[in-house]
C-alpha cells in the first residue's frame, strides 16, 4: 500500500519479493523504474493504471509466472526489454 506523493517506483523496489503474486498499482504512480519487480517469481498478475506513462528497462525481468498484465492506457511507453525472461501464452 502506497500513500502520498510517490510518483515513481524506485529502481528494484520490489526486486526478489518472492511472495508477491498480485499487485494493483495506485493512480498516483507515473513511472515504474528499472527492475522494479525483477525476479518476483510468484507474480502472476499486475494492473497498471492510466497514470503510468513509462515502464522502464527490465521492470518485470524474470517474473516467470506472470500471466496477466493489465495496462489501462494506450499512451504508456514500454521499453522493449520490460518483460525479459517472461514467458507469455497468447490467449484470444
Identify the role of each PLM range.
Residues 1-8, 18-31, 41-54, 64-77, ...:
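Structural signature of tandem-repeat unit edges
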Amino acid at each position: 500500500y502506497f500513500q502520498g506523493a510517490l510518483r515513481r517506483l524506485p529502481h528494484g523496489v520490489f526486486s526478489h519479493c518472492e511472495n508477491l503474486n498480485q499487485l494493483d498499482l495506485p493512480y498516483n504512480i507515473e513511472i515504474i523504474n528499472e527492475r522494479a519487480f525483477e525476479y518476483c517469481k510468484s507474480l502472476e498478475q499486475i494492473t497498471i493504471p492510466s497514470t503510468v506513462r513509462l515502464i522502464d528497462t527490465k521492470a518485470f525481468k524474470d517474473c516467470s509466472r506472470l500471466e496477466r498484465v493489465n495496462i489501462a492506457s494506450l499512451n504508456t511507453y514500454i521499453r522493449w526489454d520490460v518483460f525479459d525472461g517472461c514467458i507469455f501464452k497468447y490467449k484470444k
